[in-house]
Each structure stands twice: as C-alpha cells, then as structure tokens.
Amino acid sequence: MTLSGSGSASDMSGQTVLSADDADIDVVGEGDEALDKDSECESTAGHTDEVGELGGKEIPRSPSGSGTEAEGKGESQQQQQEGIQNKPKNSLVKPPYSYIALITMSILQSPQKKLTLSGICEFISNRFPYYREKFPAWQNSIRHNLSLNDCFVKIPREPGNPGKGNYWTLDPQSEDMFDNGSFLRRRKRFKRQQQDSLREQTALMMQSFGAYSLASPYGRHYGLHPAAYTHPAALQYPYIPPVGHMLPPAVPLLPSSELTRKAFSSQLSPSLQLQLSSLSSTAASIIKSEPSSRPSFSIENIIGVSAASSAAPHTFLRPPVTVQSALMSHQPLALSRSTAAIGPILSVPTNLISGQFLPTAAAAVAKWPAQ
C-alpha cells in the first residue's frame, strides 16, 4: 500500500512531473513557436530588407541609364542643330564693303568699264551669297548710291543699242578714291569739280538770255549803257526786226517834246551824244554831195514838206539816209546787250529825230528841183 501509494504517489508525482514537464514542454514549445515565429518574422523582415536593398539599388540604376541615354541623345540633337545653323550663318555674313566699293568692283571687272543697274546687281549677287539671299532689299540702296555720288557718271544708251536702263561708269578723277587700292578704306567723298569751260559757257548763255529773263536778279534796264554787250546779230545784219511785241513798254507815256528831251538827254551818255551829232553832220554832207538832178521826191511830197516847214519849222520828213541805218552801219557805237536797248529810239517818231539831229536837211531838200 505504501509502495502502491508511493508508487501511486510516485506515479502521481511522475504524472505531475510529466504534466509539469509537459507543461514545461508546452511552455518551451510555445517559446519555440514564438522563437520560430520571431525567426520567421526576422527572416521575412530580413528578406524584405534585402529585397528593399536590392530594389533600392536597382531602381536608381535603371533611371540613371535612361538619363545618360537621354543626355546623349539630347547632346547629339543639339550638335546636329548647331551644325545645321552654323552652315547658313557662315553664308549670311555681311561683307565688310560699302555700297560704293561694291559698285566700283562691279564696274572695274566689266570689259567695257561700264554696267547697267541690273548688271551691277547681278555681279554682287554672284560674288556674295549674303546679297544673293537678300536680293530685293538692297537694290534701291545701289540705285541711290549711283545717283547721289559724283564718282559715278551716267552714260545714256546708244540709239542702236537695244536694252533697258542707262550705263554707269567711274569718273576718271576718282581713281584714287580708295586708300592704296583697298576697297575697305575710302579716303574721302569724291566731288566733281566744274570745268572752267563749262562755267564760261554758262556765263555766256546767261548774258545772252539776260535781256529776256524777267526773273533776273540783276534786273533789266532799258536804254543804252556805256559798257554794254554788243549783240552779234547787230554786226552781221544791217536791219534788226522790231521786238516791241516781245517786250513790255519801258518808257512812260509823255508828250513828244518831253519824250524827245528825256529819252535822249537822260539815257545817252555824252560820248554817244557826240557820236550822234557827228553822224548828223555826216548825213548832211552826204545829202549835199548828191547830184541835184536825182528825182527823190514827188510833187505831193514837196508840197507836204513846204506846208510842214511853214507850220513847224523844226520838223521835216525823213531824208533818204535814215538815222536807223546810220546807227546800224556805224561800228564804234556801243549798243546794249540785246535789241531791246534800242527800242525807245525806234519808237520815237522819225520827224522828231530828223528835226533834232539834222537841222540842215531842210535847206538841202528845198534846193532839190521838183519834177
């Protein structure tokens, strides 16, 4: 009993021990399971950490490779674009020459040393690509430089040479316009000097047409002057046609006596008055030297002369030799620059002129026999 009891007790204790062991085992098992769970968690966490590390390493690698490839592609595209842009930039560089230099180049390279506007533009376009690509914009500049600079001379086109536009050439005096033959440097602006012969011809033309120029700055004086210009027509032809219809009236309307006194005493110089008096005496001597048998007048004229002499002793008819012919045939007499100067003299009645300058003509006429 004791043994059994002890055995039972031992069994019980053993059972209890076993149960305790079992309990301990169970506890250990639970701990192992917890450890296993912890190890599994740690392994999963480590695996996830490794995967995270691997993923973190792989993720930056993939974009880094694509970025380098993109950068390489971008650089290649930029280089291609720069290469494409560099080609036209090199051809669009504006030449360092002025328009005058370009025109001079084109004229000098031509065989005839003259070109039209179209020929000049064609040479510049073929020589310089910049102007070839911008052709219509600079053509007016070439035209303005041709017309505004004295170094370029316009040559009209010959009648038998068909075409359009005039020729342009260089002035011979503008050869040294550029410094040492370099078209990059121009010494100074060339100005054409007017020749002396052209100036003399212009002055002669102004003197010739000065009498008919109403807008002349020097004005126009009617009458005779001591130092006046002798018209060539007065020396070649004995008779000058009247020009009264071309000129306005120069002498105011006055009585005949006042007109005679003022027109000749004020406008004629003393030397001319002496010459006219000598002409009157010469005319009187010519009339006296003519033969008396020459039939110069009719009966009606003689009767008219006698009546006029009785009414006005100082007025007579015109003698055979007129004052106009004497004035025109006398060479030393200085006339005005045109026929307008003798207009007042021709407008005076002839009987007044003969009465003043030929007082002895009445006696000569009275001696002629009537027929």
Curated annotation (Swiss-Prot):
Ranges where the record places region tle4-binding: 297-303
Segments of skewed composition (Low complexity): 75-85
GO CC annotations, alphabetized: nucleus
Alphabetized PROSITE patterns for the sequence: FORK_HEAD_2, FORK_HEAD_3
Residue ranges of the region described as Disordered: 1-90
Organism: Xenopus laevis (African clawed frog)
One term of GO molecular function: DNA binding
InterPro entries with a match to the protein in the record: FH_FOXD3 (IPR047392), Fork_head_dom (IPR001766), FOX_domain-containing (IPR050211), TF_fork_head_CS_2 (IPR030456), WH-like_DNA-bd_sf (IPR036388), WH_DNA-bd_sf (IPR036390)
Location within or outside the cell: Nucleus
Biological role stated in the UniProt entry: Transcriptional repressor that is an essential upstream regulator of neural crest determination and mesoderm induction. Functions by recruiting the transcriptional corepressor tle4. Also acts in a negative auto-regulator loop by inhibiting the transcription of its own gene.
PANTHER family: FORKHEAD BOX PROTEIN (PTHR11829), FORKHEAD BOX PROTEIN D4-LIKE 1 (PTHR11829:SF361)
Tissues where the protein occurs: Initially located within the dorsal blastopore lip (Spemann organizer) at the mid-gastrula stage. As expression fades in the neuroectoderm, expression begins in the head mesoderm in two regions at the lateral borders of the presumptive neural plate. These regions correspond to neural crest cells originating from the mesencephalon (anterior) and the rhombencephalon (posterior; rhombomeres 2, 4 and 6). Subsequently expressed within trunk premigratory neural crest cells.
Residue ranges: DNA binding: 94-188
Keyword RNA-binding: no
Listed GO biological process terms: anatomical structure morphogenesis; cell differentiation; mesoderm formation; negative regulation of DNA-templated transcription; negative regulation of neurogenesis; nervous system development; neural crest cell fate commitment; positive regulation of neurogenesis
Protein name: Forkhead box protein D3-A
Induction summary: By dorsal wnt signaling. Inhibited by bmp signaling.
Biased composition (Polar residues): 1-18
Biased composition (Basic and acidic residues): 47-60
Biased composition (Acidic residues): 21-33
Name of the coding gene: foxd3-a
Keywords, sorted A to Z: Developmental protein, Differentiation, DNA-binding, Neurogenesis, Nucleus, Repressor, Transcription, Transcription regulation
Entry note about domains: The C-terminus is required for transcriptional repression and mesoderm induction.
Subunit-level organization: Interacts with tle4.
Documented effect of changing N140A: Reduces mesoderm-inducing activity
